[in-house]
């Protein structure tokens, strides 16, 4: 009886473990920066995006995103950094060098302008890559044509200045290393529904475009 009980316990343990969700394969980290801008804006965005991607893509993202500082070696633990906010962005010389090394080594940075970042984030990234210029991505770029097809480029999620959304990129040796989404506000669309009260179809477009970015970076990146 003792042997049978032990075997039953082992079988039950195996059965339970077989239904346990797999450990997250990777995390999207939120980038903390200096200068006074609210790097912590849209706190529910990344968890909600992770949940959407885990349901709709063959992927397993940690739903609890870590926060990393621009100058920390910890950024090298995460293949994808997300940066957002409304205001000033400042990188010290050491932070700029750390970010440069990270991006050259294969890391990816998504900057989502939450409104008001543009005058600050461009000089900050110029400090990281003085030799590079942001290039507007054409609607034909693969990031718009992953699982979800966006024939006209970025969707407009949150209205501010009646301007069209634009996607800009920094390229290093033919690889898109930084995607800057401007006048779009994807992160607002990823927030909990009751935060901005965006229409559900608008939120779905935001999630779908976010999923495209994730799929492009991890599953289908091709810039050539």
Regions found by a protein language model. Name each.
Residues 1-6:
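Positively charged n-region of N-terminal signal peptides that target proteins for export
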Residues 7-17:
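Bacterial N-terminal signal peptides
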Residues 19-80, 84-87, 185-186, 192-224:
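Aromatic-Pro/Gly-enriched surface loop or interdomain linker
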Residues 21-24, 73-77, 103-104, 161, ...:
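Extracellular/periplasmic catalytic domains that process cell-envelope and extracellular macromolecules
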Residues 28, 80-119:
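Short alpha-beta junction capping motif
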Residues 35-36, 44-45, 118-194, 202-211:
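An acidic, glycine-rich "communication" segment
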Residues 63-70, 92-98, 162-166:
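Alpha-helical scaffolding within the catalytic cores
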Residues 107, 129-130, 218, 222:
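Hydrophobic/aromatic-lined pockets within catalytic cores
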């Amino acid at each position: 009886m003792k042997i049978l009980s032990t075997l039953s316990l082992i079988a039950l343990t195996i059965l339970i473990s077989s239904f346990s969700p797999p450990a997250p394969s990777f995390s999207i980290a939120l980038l903390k920066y200096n200068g006074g801008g609210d790097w912590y804006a849209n706190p529910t965005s990344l968890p909600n995006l992770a949940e959407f991607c885990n349901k709709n893509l063959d992927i397993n993202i940690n739903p609890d995103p870590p926060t990393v500082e621009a100058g920390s070696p910890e950024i090298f633990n995460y293949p994808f950094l997300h940066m957002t906010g409304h205001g000033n962005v400042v990188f010290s010389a050491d932070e700029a060098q750390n970010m440069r090394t990270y991006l050259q080594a294969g890391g990816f940075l998504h900057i989502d302008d939450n409104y008001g970042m543009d005058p600050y984030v461009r000089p900050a990234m110029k400090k990281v890559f003085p030799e590079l210029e942001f290039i507007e991505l054409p609607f034909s770029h693969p990031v718009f044509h992953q699982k979800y097809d966006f024939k006209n480029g970025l969707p407009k999620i949150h209205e501010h200045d009646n301007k069209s959304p634009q996607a800009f990129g920094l390229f290093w040796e033919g690889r898109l290393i930084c995607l800057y989404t401007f006048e779009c506000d994807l992160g607002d669309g990823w927030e909990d529904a009751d935060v901005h009260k965006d229409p559900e179809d608008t939120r779905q477009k935001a999630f779908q475009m976010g999923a495209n970015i994730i799929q492009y970076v991890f599953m289908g990146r091709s810039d050539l």
